[in-house]
């Protein structure tokens, strides 16, 4: 670290008695730092520590810590110093508060208990996470180990002798050997430390070339190398993945939470999408298997398989080999057809008549003026039949030789090859035609079903004369119903009913008026039978309601007889006379 000339006396003079000792220490040893480093501490701490009696001892301890830090930084290589000089130095206040507080953290940690900080006004400090429900029995606190969560970088590295100690912790391997005292710089984006990879440097285990390995890549402060640690800001080699301990100091805090507690997922990264930038994730997903990808920070479990939230899901998608088989199966019938077409078509050997036609066709064409092949074939057929047996035998012999030659040239050929192809073509044509017809029919049926409206039976409103339909059926079914209507109420009514019954059944009532008259006659017959048995009693004429439409017009036209008194012997002459006119009307 570059040192300035010690003029500490002037700085301590303005701050009071508490600052005199530290100013003298600064003036006595030049390696304690510049004046501007001590002024904020004296101004801020002096106000609170002046009334207390042990302020001088506390400041003495802080001076010792700072001197050890500065001495250790001076012991680094000359390249580290020169590199640190080239880098723009941040504001001195950003490092003063963590250094001052580090001594307060270190002293109670050595005595195995934690005291309240003497500077409660510092906002960016190490906070003991005593209220987090995820750390009481979680994987980071074996045996009730105390957990300290820090806010953000820059990291202040200390020697391994100043390791955070806790006597109750049985496994010190879970704690880091350096205490990262953190502060959130206001001039940087809050998500800057999470995006740790660049497009240019993806070499496992090697820091950027413009920084030496001895310098912290974030702050520029020289840091002591430790063999058991690897920088979490660079990808790890695949062999070193399983050797990383769980350092508590490297837990990446979540942005926006007041206590910076761990998420319920344990070591899950709070920003899995920001662990690697876009080019890095595409490179990892396309070129590396999941076992070759290093975790984004060493807080992950010590296994070769990274967290699924960090590995891009594109890695898990494997190309499906069965997708090629349908294409092959689709192409197979086409290729078979092409191969069949490529085969040369072997004609069958010529028979005797074909040989004769081949020989005589040119002569017939020369003799005849006809150009049609069908007419020429007919002429050749007539001439073939006109030949004698001897002449035909010559062509039969030629045909036999032709077959022998054909069998020698094509030993595996059979006539089924040619005819089978023709049949296949016919079948395919028929199938295609039937399928096209079926498709046309289905399309027409679908259109018809869409265009058709549901048929609803149209029923006209019933007329009042339709009401006694039940009485019509009962009248025609029972053979003795119209008998009393055609006969007198005397005893020989049975003979008249037998003679007159075919009349009433054969005369088909064509109009509804005639059926209405039949129903009136049936009711009058019932009234006559009841009146002969019981003259004084009320007739059962009104046992069935008589509709007005079914009554004959003569009955409705004579109100004195029927409506005046409802006795049967008064209504009987009118009802008996009406069916006689019905029989005479229906006869002609």
From Swiss-Prot:
Q: Which SMART domains match?
A: HMG
Region annotation (CTNNB1-binding) ranges: 1-74
Q: What is its main location?
A: nucleus
Cellular-component GO terms for this entry = beta-catenin-TCF complex; chromatin; cytosol; nucleoplasm; nucleus
Q: Which UniProt keywords apply?
A: Activator, DNA-binding, Nucleus, Repressor, Transcription, Transcription regulation, Wnt signaling pathway
Q: Where is this region: Disordered?
A: 1-101, 203-234, 409-506
Q: Where is this motif: Nuclear localization signal?
A: 421-427
Q: What top-level branch of life does the organism fall under?
A: Eukaryota
Cite the record's Low complexity compositional bias ranges. Answer: 67-81, 431-441, 478-497
PANTHER family xrefs: TRANSCRIPTION FACTOR 7 FAMILY MEMBER, TRANSCRIPTION FACTOR 7-LIKE 1
What's in the domain note?
Answer: The putative Groucho interaction domain between the N-terminal CTNNB1 binding domain and the HMG-box is necessary for repression of the transactivation mediated by TCF7L1 and CTNNB1.
Q: Which family does it belong to?
A: Belongs to the TCF/LEF family.
The record describes its quaternary structure and partners as: Binds the armadillo repeat of CTNNB1 and forms a stable complex. Interacts with DAZAP2.
Name by which UniProt lists this protein: Transcription factor 7-like 1
Primary gene name: TCF7L1
């Amino acid at each position: 670290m570059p040192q300035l000339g010690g003029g500490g006396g002037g700085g301590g003079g303005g701050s009071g008695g508490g600052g005199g000792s530290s100013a003298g220490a600064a003036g006595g040893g030049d390696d304690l730092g510049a004046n501007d480093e001590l002024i904020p501490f004296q101004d801020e701490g002096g106000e609170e520590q002046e009334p207390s009696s042990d302020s001088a001892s506390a400041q003495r301890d802080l001076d010792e810590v700072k001197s050890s830090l500065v001495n250790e930084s001076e012991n680094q290589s000359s390249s580290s110093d020169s590199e640190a000089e080239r880098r723009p130095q941040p504001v001195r206040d950003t490092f003063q508060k963590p250094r001052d507080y580090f001594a307060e953290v270190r002293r109670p940690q050595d005595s195995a208990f934690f005291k309240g900080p003497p500077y409660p006004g510092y906002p960016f400090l190490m906070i003991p996470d005593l209220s987090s429900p995820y750390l009481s029995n979680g994987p980071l606190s074996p045996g009730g180990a105390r957990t300290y969560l820090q806010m953000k970088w820059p990291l202040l590295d200390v020697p391994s002798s100043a390791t955070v100690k806790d006597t109750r912790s049985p496994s010190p391997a879970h704690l880091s050997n350096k205490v990262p005292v953190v502060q959130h710089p206001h001039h940087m984006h809050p998500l800057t430390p999470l995006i740790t990879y660049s497009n240019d440097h993806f070499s496992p285990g090697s820091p950027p070339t413009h920084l030496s390995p001895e310098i912290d890549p974030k702050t520029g402060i020289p840091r002591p190398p430790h063999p058991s640690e690897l920088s979490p800001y660079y990808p790890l080699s695949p062999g070193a993945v399983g050797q990383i301990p769980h350092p508590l100091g490297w837990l990446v805090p979540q942005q926006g939470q007041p206590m910076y507690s761990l998420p319920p997922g344990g070591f899950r990264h709070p920003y899995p999408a920001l662990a690697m930038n876009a080019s890095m994730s595409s490179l990892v997903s396309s070129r590396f298997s999941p076992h070759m990808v290093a975790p984004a920070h060493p807080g992950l479990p010590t296994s070769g398989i990274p967290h699924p939230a960090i590995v891009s899901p594109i890695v898990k998608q494997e190309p499906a080999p069965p997708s090629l088989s349908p294409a092959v199966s689709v192409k197979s019938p086409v290729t078979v057809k092409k191969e069949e077409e490529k085969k040369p078509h072997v004609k069958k050997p010529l028979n005797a008549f074909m040989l004769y036609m081949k020989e005589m066709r040119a002569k017939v064409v020369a003799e005849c003026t006809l150009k049609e092949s069908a007419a020429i074939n007919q002429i050749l057929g007539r001439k073939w039949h006109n030949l004698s047996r001897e002449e035909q035998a010559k062509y039969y012999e030629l045909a036999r030789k032709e077959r022998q030659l054909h069998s020698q040239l094509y030993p595996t050929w059979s006539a089924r090859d040619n005819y089978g192809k023709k049949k296949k073509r016919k079948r395919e044509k028929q199938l295609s035609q039937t399928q096209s017809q079926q498709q046309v029919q289905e399309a027409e049926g679908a259109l018809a079903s869409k265009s058709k409206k549901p048929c609803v039976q149209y029923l006209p409103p019933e007329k009042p004369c339709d009401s006694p339909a039940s009485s019509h059926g009962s009248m025609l079914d029972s053979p003795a119903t119209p008998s009393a209507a055609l006969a007198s109420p005397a005893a020989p009514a049975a003979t008249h009913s037998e003679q007159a019954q075919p009349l009433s059944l054969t005369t088909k009532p064509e109009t509804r008026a005639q059926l209405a008259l039949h129903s009136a006659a049936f009711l009058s017959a019932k009234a006559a039978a009841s009146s002969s048995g019981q003259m004084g009693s009320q007739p059962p004429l009104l046992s069935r309601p008589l509709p007005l439409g079914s009554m004959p017009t003569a009955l409705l036209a004579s109100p004195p007889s029927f409506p005046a008194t409802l006795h049967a012997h008064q209504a009987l002459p009118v009802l008996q006379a009406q069916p006689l006119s019905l029989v005479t009307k229906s006869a002609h």
